[in-house]
From Swiss-Prot:
An example molecular function term from Gene Ontology annotations: protein phosphatase 2A binding
Superkingdom to which the source organism belongs: Eukaryota
Compositional bias (Low complexity): 219-229, 498-525
Subunit structure, interactors included: Interacts with MARK1, MARK2, MARK3 and MARK4. Interacts with SQSTM1 when polyubiquitinated. Interacts with PSMC2 through SQSTM1. Interacts with FKBP4. Binds to CSNK1D. Interacts with SGK1. Interacts with EPM2A; the interaction dephosphorylates MAPT at Ser-388. Interacts with PIN1. Interacts with LRRK2. Interacts with LRP1, leading to endocytosis; this interaction is reduced in the presence of LRPAP1/RAP.
Name of the protein: Microtubule-associated protein tau
Paired cysteines (S-S): C602-C633
N6-methyllysine, modified sites: K570
Gene name in the database record: Mapt
Polar residues bias spans: 50-60, 142-151, 233-252, 387-400, 432-446
Cross-link for Glycyl lysine isopeptide (Lys-Gly) (interchain with G-Cter in ubiquitin), residue positions: 33, 565, 570, 578, 592, 609, 622, 628, 632, 642, 654, 658, 664, 680, 686, 696
Organism from which the protein derives: Rattus norvegicus
Positions carrying N-acetylalanine: A2
Ranges annotated as biased composition (Acidic residues): 205-218
Keyword terms of this UniProt record: Acetylation, Cell membrane, Cell projection, Cytoplasm, Cytoskeleton, Disulfide bond, Isopeptide bond, Membrane, Methylation, Microtubule, Phosphoprotein, Repeat, Secreted, Ubl conjugation
A single BP term in Gene Ontology: mRNA transport
Length: 752
């Protein structure tokens, strides 16, 4: 039996690949209209619909999804399974050969691989719960799983009316219901084909165990999906859960356990209808929200507490909203407890089916599974409590231990009380569960450690004297009310106290059991489980605190708005501002300035008239008459300037300097200058100064000049009569007269 479990672990690694492929399978629900046509198979037949064309592109686990989508059409199922093309280099697991047996394999009885296929796709449905809403790929896979799970177990589906009753109240949208009906019709067509094969499977315990796993995996999807997307719970989960209501203890869909009381068909509809109305009444919403926050406490089963709030809301609504249904729920639970006592030893694997045989990484899947396990545990503990604890045994079978003496968290908390309607004081709840798990030693040791560790922790919370709550409920309530106690108290005692007492059922009836009383009681003043009245008082006090405290926090009185009418601004300029909130009337008065009476400061602009309204601008230009203006310079007096561009007449007169000007130098007297460029006439006169000149000083020298012939060409003779000063004594030398004449003549020739 260990081999199929190990194969589940290996196959779950492939289930992770489905998450990667969901984005690529967006058109799966629409028949893959955009995908290329399917190439014909070897025998020449072409697959109708070519639904696996996307899967052919890659040899990854996407090939596994190809047969899954094809099974959605019953008439195309045989051809789709027989003619699926497998790329080269693809393993059997990837191609889906080992996971999806065709009709021949099913007829031959190859059943060992079928549970693997169911678990894989139940996981693939739950891998990404956040993507449930409105996505075609998930709905397609969910339809396939909807076909496979009930048909493999060989159980006929409930009638269509019952399925609709279970589908509709859970908030299913109309399109989801329409999508689920074709799948349900396909199930009715497939179930006869596989009925003989399903009956063969009932022979072995291993197959029963695998059916348990399938049923719980199908049951786990509604809480996990409803908690994240309440409107899109898969039709598979709903139909299976509806059919497996009576057979909840054995977890075999369609085969109710012996002695179990089947619930009416409209039970889930009433429960779901009350679920939507009742959770806001009590503190159920608080634990449900904080249940997710408290999840990290359990490193092994993180999802245990995450899924519990959904069941809390579902069953809590049953007790608070409808007392009549509470009686119904308690009645079947008593039957389940008695039935479970008989089935507990024969089927050792049965409680283990609720255990996480698969990797803990599948978070949403374990949510509902552990929630389902909590139901089994409550039934088991009820039976055990009846045998061990006298207080439970005394209570009537119809209302086992929910007498007013044990309201505990349930009395004040509508979520916790209904979660286990048949729960006794349950000191032995978790040990009972662990003991039922221990026979399944075939599973790896790590799984058993996980069971003891995680279930010890959760069970520690369940098995408190107030243990009327499922592990998720207890965990959430502990997390909300005494967050400090949740981690330290349950972890240490369960490890020490519970495992040795797992086999001893009577040991937990003792009031002084170390594991349960001190560590699990919320108030330290209640050490022993038998003392239920004090616990009742303490529990009644404590639970309302968190809702009241949260309400006091949430419902703080709003601060009144300050009166801004009496506030005056510190800036004086804003006092005259009036603001009308409704949008006041803004009047902008445009007054035109009359500038007709304004006189400009500049006198020259007096005649400029400006009309503000854009009138005609008249600029009067008066030309300046310069005819009367006389220039300061007399020579410009005859210049006439006309401002309009008149004629400029410049008269130039020649000046005669001879008449007015006398030259200081006598030689220039006869020079006449004509302004226009006249003739220059230079007259040279002989100088006769020698004749009149006398030397001022007589130096006694004689200048002898003898010139028998007076000629201008002769060289100057020796001047004997010239004094040292240069003056010539004309008296002493009679010859100077002639000398002077010669010098003057020579100078005249030279142009002097």
């Amino acid at each position: 039996m260990a081999e199929p479990r190990q194969e589940f672990d290996t196959m779950e690694d492939q289930a992770g690949d489905y998450t990667m492929l969901q984005d690529q399978e967006g058109d799966m629900d629409h028949g893959l209209k955009e995908s290329p046509p399917q190439p014909p198979a070897d025998d020449g037949s072409e697959e109708p619909g070519s639904e696996t064309s996307d899967a052919k592109s890659t040899p990854t686990a996407e090939d596994v999804t190809a047969p899954l989508v094809e099974e959605r059409a019953p008439d195309k199922q045989a051809t789709a399974q027989s003619h699926t093309e497998i790329p080269e280099g693809t393993t059997a697991e990837e191609a889906g050969i080992g996971d999806t047996p065709n009709m021949e394999d099913q007829a031959a009885g190859h059943v060992t691989q079928e549970p693997q296929k169911v678990e894989i796709f139940s996981q693939s449905l739950l891998v990404e719960p956040g993507r449930r809403e409105g996505q075609a790929p998930d709905s397609g896979i969910s339809d396939w799983t909807h076909q496979q799970v009930p048909s493999m177990s060989g159980a006929p589906l409930p009638p269509q009316g019952l399925r609709e009753a279970t589908h509709q109240p859970l908030g299913t949208r109309p399109e989801d219901v329409e999508r689920s009906h074709p799948a349900s019709e396909l199930l009715w067509q497939e179930s006869p084909q596989k009925e003989a094969w399903g009956k063969d499977r009932l022979g072995s315990e291993e197959e029963v165990d695998e059916d348990i796993t399938m049923d719980e995996s199908s049951q786990e999807s509604p809480p996990s999906q409803a908690s994240l997307a309440p409107g899109t719970a898969t039709p598979q989960a709903r139909s299976v859960s509806a059919s497996g209501v009576s057979g909840e203890t054995t977890s075999i869909p369609g085969f109710p356990a012996e002695g179990s009381i089947p619930l009416p068909a409209d039970f889930f509809s009433k429960v779901s209808a009350e679920t939507q109305a009742s959770p806001p009444e009590g503190p159920g919403t608080g634990p449900s929200e904080e249940g997710h926050e408290a999840a990290p406490e359990f490193t092994f089963h993180v999802e245990i507490k995450a899924s519990a709030p959904k069941e809390q809301d579902l069953e809590g609504a049953t007790v608070v909203g409808a007392p009549a249904e509470e009686q119904k729920a308690r009645g079947p639970s008593v039957g389940k407890g008695t039935k479970e006592a008989s089935l507990l030893e024969p089927t050792d694997k049965q409680p283990a089916a609720g255990l996480p045989g698969r990797p803990v990484s599948r978070v949403p899947q374990l949510k509902a599974r552990v929630a389902g396990v909590s139901k089994d545990r409550t039934g088991n503990d009820e039976k055990k409590a009846k045998t061990s604890t006298p207080s439970c045994a005394k209570t009537p079978s119809n209302r086992p231990c929910l007498s007013p003496t044990r309201p505990t968290p349930g009395s004040s908390d509508p979520l916790i009380k209904p979660s286990s309607p048949a729960v006794c004081p349950e000191p032995a709840t978790s040990p009972k569960y662990v003991s039922s798990v221990t026979p399944r030693n075939g599973s790896p040791g790590t799984k058993q450690m996980k069971l003891k560790g995680a279930d010890g922790k959760t069970g520690a919370k369940i098995a408190t004297p107030r243990g009327a709550a499922t592990p998720g409920q207890k965990g959430t309530s502990n997390a909300t009310r005494i967050p400090a106690k949740t981690t330290p108290s349950p972890k240490t005692p369960p490890g020490s106290g519970e495992p040795p007492k797992s086999g001893e059922r009577s040991g937990y009836s003792s009031p002084g059991s170390p594991g349960t009383p001190g560590s699990r009681s919320r108030t330290p003043s209640l050490p022993t489980p038998p003392t239920r009245e004090p616990k009742k008082v303490a529990v009644v006090r404590t639970p309302p605190k968190s809702p009241s405290a949260s309400k006091s926090r949430l419902q703080t009185a709003p601060v009144p708005m300050p009166d801004l009418k009496n506030v005056r601004s510190k800036i004086g300029s804003t006092e005259n501002l009036k603001h009308q909130p409704g949008g006041g009337k803004v009047q902008i008065i445009n007054k035109k300035l009359d500038l007709s009476n304004v006189q400009s400061k500049c006198g020259s602009k007096d005649n400029i008239k400006h009309v503000p309204g854009g009138g005609s601008v008249h600029i009067v230009y008066k030309p300046v008459d310069l005819s009367k203006v006389t220039s300061k310079c007399g020579s410009l007096g005859n210049i006439h300037h006309k401002p309009g561009g008149g004629q400029v007449e410049v008269k130039s007169e020649k000046l005669d300097f001879k008449d007015r000007v006398q030259s200081k130098i006598g030689s220039l007297d006869n020079i006449t200058h004509v302004p226009g460029g006249g003739n220059k006439k230079i007259e040279t006169h002989k100088l006769t100064f020698r004749e009149n000149a006398k030397a001022k000083t007589d130096h006694g020298a004689e200048i002898v000049y003898k010139s028998p012939v007076v000629s201008g060409d002769t060289s100057p003779r020796h001047l004997s009569n010239v004094s040292s000063t240069g003056s010539i004594d004309m008296v002493d030398s009679p010859q100077l007269a002639t000398l002077a004449d010669e010098v003057s003549a020579s100078l005249a020739k030279q142009g002097l």
